[in-house]
Amino acid sequence: MKRLIAIIFLMLISLSDKAQTNLYYPPAGNTVWDTISPNSLGWCQERIDTLLNYLQLKNTKSFIIIKDGKIALEKYYGTFTKDSLWYWASAGKSLTAFLTGMAQEEGALDINDSTSKYLGIGWTNETPEQEGLIKVWHQLTMTSGLDYDVVDNDCTDPTCLNYLGDAGSFWYYYNAPYRLINNVIESATGINYNSYTNSRVKTRIGMSSGIWVQDVFYSRTRDAARFGLLMLGKGIWNSDTLMHDTNYYNAMINTSQAYNESYGYLWWLNGKSSNMLPGTSLVFQGEIVPNAPADMYAALGKNDQKIYVVPSENMVVVRMGNSAELSLFAVSNFDNELWARVSTLECSGTGVNETTAQPTVSLYPNPTANNLTISFSTPLTKSSIIELYNFNGQLIYGEVLVEGSNTYNLNIGTQPSGIYIYKVQTDAGYVTGKVVIE
């Protein structure tokens, strides 16, 4: 039996690899890109319309689905066009991870080197011994050990970079150490970061746009899709192998450390048994996007900038725009809602209106003293749970919400003033957010 399972697993891998070698790669520029008919994929027009209407309601500016390298669906909203530029926010982290791998492959740097080798001693406010423990690898995996309780999450001045724990002792989504990877690459290669991006990636995959401005990458939507297609092709663009180092490529898109299963080298990973999210040290059970394929990995940015890569479906999905709901870093509730619709485009499957969709959750008043009202957009069909955690990750309140209503009044008791994390677990997944107690 075990032998049969192993054979089936190897066959699935073989089929996935074969599909990815048959990818179409568009020529350079922003004009020519072959398309594939949604009808040929068995997608229902009614469900496509539902998806596109939902995206419009959620402040989307552009949306693309790439299937087998070809455009299956492309939509722009308002005055935004295929020639408009938009920011990637933290989705640009994943591009930096790729560029770091290229710099290592060229012999310019080693991610296991101390960051001080490239930035010099004193790039932090730590002792030389503490600072010396931080490797480029720790910057890629969000495990630098630096104190994230700062006024400005993006401040890279040494005075902002203080010791909290040894490098590798915890995971926390902290921007400043990541931003300094750009400086590491510039120091190691002797090349301006924009120039390095242009010569190593942008020109080679035919991007018509792309520029770093104050550590944030901007491009056209199709160029974001090109990067997703490069990743889907395992670092190969047509006949040009940009990344030969398969070990580094695989490390980028697999669990990188012991704390957050759902994080690789600046890439978010679906299909894991637990996850940690930006802004908290809590470990949540379950995958980050339950409605998406388990093998999906993603470049995710603030205000719902998304580049999803799905090897099993030979698919890349890109969304750019303003925040769909709350303004959150990287992962948001929008991910799961979007994939509830993308995953049900096929006419032969169950439509999103027939499946369990995550209701919209509101908590008010926020800030509050000791009473909260939680409201759902639709009545609960099954019992749910709300939990409240302090910023140390301690559970300070929990209650079962019985099905049948969409509004619940909660008395959370007397709690110290501060910011708390709430988690609402429904049968469709979970929603997280912040609430302030005065």
Mark where each language-model region is.
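A short, well-structured edge-of-sheet supersecondary motif
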Residues: L51-F80, Y308, N314-V318
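Penicillin-binding protein/beta-lactamase superfamily catalytic region
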Residues: G165, K202-P311, A324-F329
